A protein has these predicted regions:
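Intrinsically disordered, low-complexity Pro/Gly/Ser/Thr-rich segments with frequent PxxP/GP/PP motifs
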Residues: 261-279, 653-686
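Beta-strand/loop-rich accessory regions of lumenal/periplasmic or secreted enzymes
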Residues: 85-86, 183, 285, 680-687, ...
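Catalytic cores of secreted or luminal carbohydrate-active enzymes
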Residues: 193-214, 570-629, 633-654, 666-668, ...
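Beta-strand-rich binding/interaction modules
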Residues: 147, 228-263, 627-661, 687-696
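Accessory beta-strand-rich segments of carbohydrate-active enzymes
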Residues: 1-13, 36-37, 51-55, 83-91, ...
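Extended acidic/polar, glycine-enriched regions
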Residues: 171-174, 234-313, 685-726, 733-735
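An acidic-aromatic loop/edge-strand motif
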Residues: 86, 91, 98-107, 156, ...
């Protein structure tokens, strides 16, 4: 019934117009075409409710459904744009690398699902604009088009615009549009991105009404020459030339220049040229996104566009924009919505960019395909550097069976053969690059073209890179997978401007930089943001800033990919991930790897990034001179042009001073420089004192309003005694005239004081019962705690932990003894901790002191068997009454914090409920801990329990046990226990980003051969 184009890599498009730049024409100038393109009288949007029928196989479609008069009464309806999986058809499937069908390019399964779409619309003929062009901005995977029963054409490449001249097919009045979308085609082998696989017409469909003679395409370039700049416009017309006028206006609306294009016969692609000279131009960059307006007038039509004057080049292994070396503080962003899937509309796109900007990112990589056209216009306007990536990924080819040699090097050796180095796919590879480049070529935000992602390297990419450099030599090129190639021949890398890598360790980057490289190093993906993480951002930041040849990178990734499935009883969303739709193959929750949840609530990792990448930092504070030295990490803007500074001094959690920091007369702090300004503050002689410096926007600044917090620094102030005085007071032995009696059995020691009864288990060296003032403190025996619910970043390490059986440990006290003193009772025990079936890995010398007033101090020394892997954690776990549901503490808060993930938190006194401590990751895991704490207090039901450390410790308070968090696959499956679970930790293993990255850095591993831990428990009546 249909031409068999969908398995022919040499028939990519039929009946489509040549690639061109994105624009929306109008009959008159319109400055609202970015946010409101529907205001153009030449733009007819065809979105809405379409008739739809799903077929499980293309062979089930026997009717000529596209014919006028076809009985479509059996059709359902579906919104366009949308993906059909989100409307009850087919099934969702998430895979990262593996093809969801047999790998036999260019062939796809015979039972190829498809969707038939029908839509009737009225076409109002306009004598001044009689031509009509039908645009599809995104369809997955390929599609056939009929209009009024006549075949119009075919196209593929899901995330790119396909345009058809339908003038001869249209009729006055009602028109009948039919579209057939196939789930798979030969192009599906090149659309193997790490995402849910979805299908349908997922971007806008519209008609453009055009005059008979008009501009077809234009290419804007800018060159800077000292105090002037040239704005050049190369253009071509449909059929024949037409009178044109090109005018440039500045942001205030003042005309800068106006010219008429002249013929340029030597330029076949754009045979008409024009250039406007701008004196004293205001340049575009990500921090100051200044835009001019360009108006292209022809009879009966006007095209309005934006121009950013900027240059980009590589020198000295650095990337320069307008002559200034830059660093990318970037993020990878998929177009993903939990309700609409691929169909991410304007408002969601704008919301994402607003959040990204507010959290101090300056760059975005469009992973791994071109985004909707208005995304780039918004990036121009808001200020982002963009790596624009072609819709090309054939990662599944790396999974081919390799003749019994399944080693990674052998997979790399063979990865390129099916597609990247296969001449049959050269046309398709170049086509995907061209469709990206030619559509987005006029966007100043785009400074790098990327050939695609994870597709190995070969002849096809050499051709794509050569074409890109020839077509647009003013921008840079990127392709990370150039390193994955066969050793059997030499390859051409001359058209790649940078060395790109994913998830490198600091050591591997240092090795590259030490070998006198000839290209800058960029991390196209790093710090995998899956679940609780990432935990290595500060280390990467410091490394990036200390090496000129390292130009920064792009976190993976912006949002969790989840499918919305309704709400829990408490109103929280339910989200599915890979495998939840009974699909196979799938890759589980590996799609839940973003800085925000599917509904765009921030993960704590997003807050961590924001403060790590704050635009300025304190270098030092000299108490004697009262001088505060700052470094400006911005690339273009002086600190005084964007930031207002305030300060706060706290002592033992109490704010004792705060105020505004004025800039001295003549003070400047240019980009990449340091300077000092005066700040005199009073510092008490005693107490743990911190100085916090806050950076606020001092005016509206590209999506960030005046007063918006850009970040903060925290400095521990030196004084005579920098210990927390409240902590010291808690460690003081309170006098008591009472005494303690001890009763001993073979199993227990029962200690009774004036207002407490404690039962000590001699077999474990731990307290089994604690009652104070007739209130129960322990619901069950306390435990030495080793396990934590593995985080997503523990996904590799947890295999070692499970092999060591850290989740099934037993505690054995070899001997115990006690001694009664005037102040209380001392209990000593020799304790071993061993996994079931394995040898012991911890020896503990334990000393408990129970004071007459009921306070209890633990002091222990631990020796670890170093043949075992690093510990998840070590500490005490207490099961307190559930009614003890309020927590107060001095430590790092208010959000969760860990040894390598605490830069969004700060030291202070915080108070909340236990439920507020829980970070509700979609896949349950360790969460809600607090690092560097002096004390924590839980209270409720008339009783309080305070834990105070001899040294700073970590704690976690939750209504979920670590066993529950470990066992359950989704947050909506969790059941709270009947206790408040308090974990008092000597330390936890760091967080890192090893879910898809290097092993946790050594300094964050809990692998001490020996350590000491001391903590005091103080019960009180509330």
């Amino acid at each position: 019934m249909i031409p068999h184009y969908y398995e022919d890599p040499h028939t990519l498009h039929v009946g489509t117009m040549p690639n061109r730049a994105y624009y929306i024409p109008s009959s008159r100038r319109s400055d609202a075409l970015v946010e409101h393109r529907e205001t153009s009288d030449r733009f007819q949007l065809l979105n809405g409710s379409w008739k739809f029928r799903y077929y499980a196989s293309i062979y089930d479609l026997q009717d000529a459904f596209y014919e006028v008069g076809y009985d479509a009464s059996a059709f359902d309806s579906i919104p366009v744009p949308s993906v059909w999986q989100n409307h009850g058809y087919d099934h969702h499937q998430y895979t990262n690398i593996r093809y969801p069908f047999p790998a036999d390019p260019p062939y796809v399964p015979k039972e190829n699902p498809c969707g038939a779409y029908l839509y009737d619309f009225t076409y109002p003929k306009d004598a001044t604009a009689p031509r009509a062009f039908l645009n599809f901005e995104g369809v997955a995977s390929c599609f056939y088009v009929w209009l009024n029963g006549q075949f119009v054409g075919y196209s593929q490449v899901a995330h790119s615009t396909s345009e058809f001249d339908v003038t001869k097919f249209l009729q006055d009045g009602t028109n009948h549009l039919a579209v057939l979308v196939l789930k798979w085609c030969d192009g599906s082998y090149m659309e193997d991105q790490d995402m849910f696989r979805m299908n349908g017409i997922f971007r806008d469909v519209y008609l453009l009404h055009r005059p008979e003679q008009c501009i077809e395409d234009y290419f804007i370039t800018t060159d800077i020459h000292g105090s002037t700049a040239g704005v050049a416009v190369r253009l071509r017309y449909y059929d024949s030339a037409v009178a044109a006028r090109i005018t440039l206006y500045d942001a205030a609306g003042t005309m800068v220049g106006s010219v008429t294009p002249v013929e340029a016969p030597d330029d076949a692609a754009f045979p008409y040229h024009a250039e406007i000279t701008v004196v004293d131009p205001t340049l575009w960059n990500a921090e100051q996104p200044y835009l001019y307006t360009l108006v292209l007038d022809t009879p009966n039509e006007t095209i309005t566009d934006r121009v950013g004057i900027r240059e980009v080049h590589v020198a000295n292994n650095q990337i320069y924009v307008n002559g200034q070396s830059i660093k990318f503080h970037g993020v990878n962003r998929h177009e993903s919505d939990p309700v609409t899937g691929y169909a991410v509309g304007f408002e969601q796109t704008k919301k994402d960019l607003l959040m990204i900007k507010k959290h101090n990112f300056n760059a975005i990589r469009t992973s791994h395909y071109p985004d909707v056209p208005y995304f780039y216009q918004l990036c121009d306007q808001y200020g982002f550097f963009v790596i624009d990536e072609a819709d090309n990924e054939s990662h599944g080819a790396s999974e081919y069976y390799c003749e019994g040699n399944e080693s990674w090097p052998n997979h790399v050796e063979n990865w390129n053969k099916p597609i990247a180095d296969n001449p049959e796919f050269t046309e398709a590879t170049v086509d995907r690059t061209r469709r990206c480049v030619e559509r987005d070529k006029n966007r100043p935000c785009v400074i790098i073209w990327s050939m695609g992602n994870e597709s190995a390297y070969g002849y096809t990419f050499e051709e794509a890179l050569a074409w890109t450099k020839s077509f647009d030599p003013r921008r840079l090129t990127h392709y990370e997978s150039a390193q994955y190639r066969s050793k059997n021949r030499k390859y051409d890398f001359s058209n790649i401007d940078m060395f790109s890598n994913m998830y490198p360790s600091l050591e591997s980057m240092q090795e590259y930089l030490d070998n006198e490289p000839d290209k800058p190093y960029i991390m196209c993906e790093y710090s995998h943001c899956m679940g609780n993480g990432p935990g290595d951002l500060e280390d990467y930041f410091q490394f990036i800033q200390s090496h000129d040849g390292l130009v920064g990178g792009f976190l993976w990734e912006w949002c969790d990919h989840g499918i919305y499935k309704g709400k829990m009883p408490d109103g929280r969303g339910i989200y599915y991930y890979g495998g939840d739709h009974n699909e196979w193959p799938h890759d589980g929750n590996f799609c839940m790897d973003g800085l925000v949840y599917p509904d765009r609530r921030p993960h704590t990792g997003l807050l961590e990034f924001k403060n790590v990448y704050r635009p300025a930092r304190v270098v030092k504070y000299d108490r004697e001179s009262g001088m505060l030295t700052l470094h400006n990490y911005m690339d273009f803007v002086d600190l005084t042009e964007y930031a207002a500074l305030t300060y706060q001094v706290s002592c033992d959690g109490e704010v004792i001073d705060n105020g505004f920091i004025p800039y001295p007369d003549g003070f400047t702090l240019p980009p990449h420089s340091e300077n000092a300004l005066p700040l005199a503050v009073h510092i008490p002689d005693k107490g743990k004192c911190f100085l916090k410096i806050f950076y606020h926007c001092d005016k509206d600044l590209s999506l960030r309003s005046e007063g918006h917090l850009l970040g903060f620094d925290e400095i521990l102030l030196e004084n005579e005694d920098s210990r927390n005085q409240k902590t010291l007071a808690m460690w003081s032995d309170a006098p008591s005239n009472s005494t303690i009696t001890v009763q001993e059995t073979d199993r227990h020691l029962t200690l009774r004081g004036k207002n407490f009864t404690y039962n000590f288990n001699k077999l474990t060296g731990l307290f089994a019962v604690m009652q104070y003032e007739d209130a129960v403190l322990l619901d069950k025996e306390m435990e030495f705690n080793i396990w934590r619910a593995p985080t997503d970043n523990d996904r590799k390490l947890k295999l070692d932990w499970l092999a060591a059986r850290y989740d099934h440990c037993m505690t054995n006290a070899y001997r115990t003894e006690y001694q009664v003193t005037d102040s209380g009772v001392t209990l000593r025990a020799k304790v071993g901790i061993a996994p079931i079936s394995l040898q012991k890995f911890l020896d503990l010398d334990v000393c408990w002191t129970v004071f007459n007033n009921g306070a209890v101090t633990l002091a222990l020394h631990a020796e670890r068997n170093t043949v075992f892997p690093e510990l998840p954690r070590f500490g005490l776990r207490l099961f307190l009454p559930k009614e003890m549901a309020r927590v107060s503490y001095f430590g790092m808060g208010p959000m969760e914090s860990y040894c390598d993930k605490h830069h969004a938190a700060s030291h202070g006194y915080f108070s909340s409920t236990i439920w507020q401590q829980h970070e509700d990751y979609i896949r349950p895991q360790e969460n809600g801990s607090h690092y560097d704490c002096d004390y924590v207090q839980l209270d409720g039901a008339g009783i309080k329990l305070t834990a105070v450390g001899a040294k700073p410790f970590c704690f976690n308070a939750s209504h979920y046990t670590q066993e529950e968090l470990t066992e359950k696959a989704h947050n909506y499956e969790l059941h709270p226990c009947d206790s408040t679970v308090l974990c008092l930790d000597y330390a936890q293993n760091g967080i890192g980003s090893a879910s898809c990255g290097p092993r946790l850095a050594e300094q964050y591993r809990l692998d001490d051969a020996s350590f000491d831990f001391s903590i005091r428990l103080i019960p009180e009546k509330a």
